[in-house]
Amino acid sequence: MESLRITDGAPGLTALVGRATGLDASASARFQSLDAGAPAVDVYVTTPFDCIASRRVSGEASRDGAVVAASDLLAALQAGRAEVGAARDPNWPGALPPREGFTVRDEVPVSVARQLADKGRELARQFSGPMGPPKSLLDSTVLT
């Protein structure tokens, strides 16, 4: 049984995991433990768009690299439980980004990110059928 004890950041993680499971009921979540002065965990979730999303919370995971069902994580977060569920490590699609060594290349203003999110939401509604949006739309470049 994997666990995630969160001391700060649960509402943001709950929102992210809720969105991920809303897009894909079989989404997975993976924990990457960090120790930057205080214990923290990056929680990554899969999406149906060939990308992952993440949120950092203060706290500790039972095991670095543990993978659980995102739906189990969401239920645990909503119930305020630390115990998340059984490990599902083989479900994770690949390697995680490195823990450090990133270089800031550019910053996107919040207004631009908000506008892109609104347009994305409109497109998601437009293609809300069982086929979803065309792959070419999902693979298009949005920011350069």
Can you annotate each of these PLM segments?
Residues M1-S58:
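N-terminal ordered "arm"
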Residues L73-T144:
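Long, compositionally biased intrinsically disordered terminal regions
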Residues V43-A87:
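Hydrophobic/aromatic-rich structural module bridging two neighboring secondary-structure elements via a short loop
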Residues M1-P11, A61-A66, G80-V84, T144:
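Generic structural signal for short, solvent-exposed loop/turn connectors between secondary structure elements
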